[in-house]
Amino acid sequence: LKYTKREFEKLLKDKLMSECNVTLDAASADQIYRCLAMITRQIMSDRQKQYQSKVLGEGKKQVYYLCMEFLMGRSLRTSLFNLGLNEVAESVLADADVKIDTIYEQEPDAGLGNGGLGRLAACYLDGMATDGIPGTGYSILYEYGIFKQKIVDGWQQETADNWLPGGQVWIKSHPDQAQEIRFDGQAIETWEGGFHHVKYENYNSVIAVPNDMYVAGYGSNGVSKLRLWQAKAPSFDMSSFNAGNYNTAISQSASAELISKILYPNDNHTEGKILRLRQQYFFSAASIADILQNHLNQYGTLDNLADKIAIQLNDTHPTVAIPEMMRILLDECSYEWDAAFDICRKVFAYTNHTVMSEALEKWNADIFRNTLPRIWQIVCEMDRRCRADLAKAFPGDQGKIDYMAIIGDNQVRTANICAYTCHAINGVSKLHSEIIKDSVFHDYFLYKPQAFKNVTNGIAYRRWLLCSNPGLTHLLEETIGDGFKTDASELKKLEKFVDDKTVQAAAAKVKRENKANFANYLQKATGQVIDPDSIFDCQVKRMHEYKRQHLNALNIAAEYLYLKNNPNAEFTPKTYIFGAKAAPGYYMAKQMIRMICKLGKLIDEDPAVRGKLRIVYLEDYCVSLSERLMPASEVSEQISLAGTEASGTGNMKFMLNGAITLGTLDGANVEIADAAGHENEIIFGMLTPEVNALKGMGYHPNAFISGDNTAMAVLDFLEKGWNGENFSEVTSNLRNSDPYMVMADFKDYRRAQHDLQELYRDKQKWNHMSLKNISNAGIFSADRSIMDYARDIWGATPVK
């Protein structure tokens, strides 16, 4: 795809005139952004049609990726880059005295995701397009996304993330392809002349309207489609409205459209639980209907479905897609149960993202039965047949059968639907995949060991390196050529230069410039001043007890007390950078945010530690902010309790940008340390077997507190608090239950932080470690992950 500068300039000027009635010279930054986005979207749409035509012409297998969220970030920069149009666009705008970065800043982050699950899904759309694997993602078009985070006096406050006005330009609605989704009511089964019939009564309909976004591959003709379903009422109730029942008419419409309002509504109450289940069925059912219609249009039969499609369920949220496909095959296509189930088994695969059995999703059976009456009937029959199959495999072991069953304790266990049905069940790191086999799904591993796979997560590395870190990209081009842009494994060529003094100096210079750039951005955006010569120590991820941001905070408090007592001690200045949202109903996570923010304020206002210690809390952390931070980062905090993080992908982005991992051997940290060398990371904490052994003996945090003067002093300090505020909820939790063993790892974490300071002073050693990480980050490319899925799970081959 090539445009000359003149051709692209004409495209932009024509679009500005037709859409906004302005010339390029007179256009606002927002108008230029919208028109550039429209041009880019149209180019991707045209390319996707050509690509899809080739896919169908060759009869290739297609992949459908169902996920509750896709954390897309901004689209313009990456789309132009992947299409090879970024330089010509930049040049055209420069002639009009417009900086392209100003245009990029007009775009809001798409409010379609929250954390690692959604970012992984977004990276995989990029990977599929680049690798030429025909892929479509399915999710919901959330009107308000997750939420915008404001920190007010230390407390997180949530406001609506009204992203659609700026983001709508990337989305094309297709109301002609809408699906009707039915909830509630009764499903009445009858048998007539040996044939099974199901009749629905008193149901409520919601219309699912598809809206499409596109993700272009880099250096390939591939384009992935992301189809997002928007909930609409079937029609406005004019009779109620005309009769004066305005509230009735409006509430019916509002109730339907509530489904696509926000991601992960608070489920601390029954209404929230019902809404979440409705969301899951809404998007799963609409997606299955869409997939089957497309297949029938192409092939005229569903008998070859398993040869032509693969459906990946990313976590358990879309599990109801399985009984929904069974419903269509049984009720609408007259398949026998065994034939229908065989199709589902061959089509569906499941990615698990959980390491704790108790965290697996379950639905109250009464809510499930009332909300999805026909799906409930099918799930009951699945449970009956599942129990019968398990009884043959484990005769007499009723406890095992009850544990593995789909329904139990008045709950529908979605993970067991997946484990029983899917032909492949994969974890997302080597450690996680072993944990799945050893504990989470141990019994299912005994039942069907061939189904269990590992696909270590990967990232869209071009976004996080080529687009976000041009300084490092340029250094790599000069040192190892540009092969790494299409093949991440080429980064390995850098390894022979890790002790080259010229390369070390150049890499250090790039890092210092990136830190200065981030410091300048932060000052302009928030007024906060940070020292670019201090260590940038970063922990950015969802706020959660298992991710142990409070362990980090405890160490900062210990360093603060140490500096107060030892004002002349040698101490390398440190800036601790946090970015995290807490789930709205997660009180302890909000307390952790308050503690970190208040500790930061105390440190800021104390002249005794000025210039030595700093905490920065990045409000409303998101993908675009991450793209600024990663190139500037030096320390990557990955400090979850061993055996609790499935994989992580932030750790990979930090590694790629030359940060040193300070972490436990958990999730993908294990593979990062294996790839770069354990001596090039700073590892601390218990190993997973040690954690399990300590739990088995009975963990008592006080055993680790009482003999540690620093631990006692820090907990007392935070418990008493300052300026009339204390953090006794957090400290009481740590003293009494400490579910994620913060206190057991605290002493070794402090040792690791001390080692970090020593290493940082040895610039040659630090630069060696940093370059080792960059040169071994290639294995964590989404391109590699997608080819693993295609080969080992989907049976899909590239379309070039």
Residue spans for each PLM region:
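A conserved ligand/cofactor-binding region detector
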Residues: 1-800
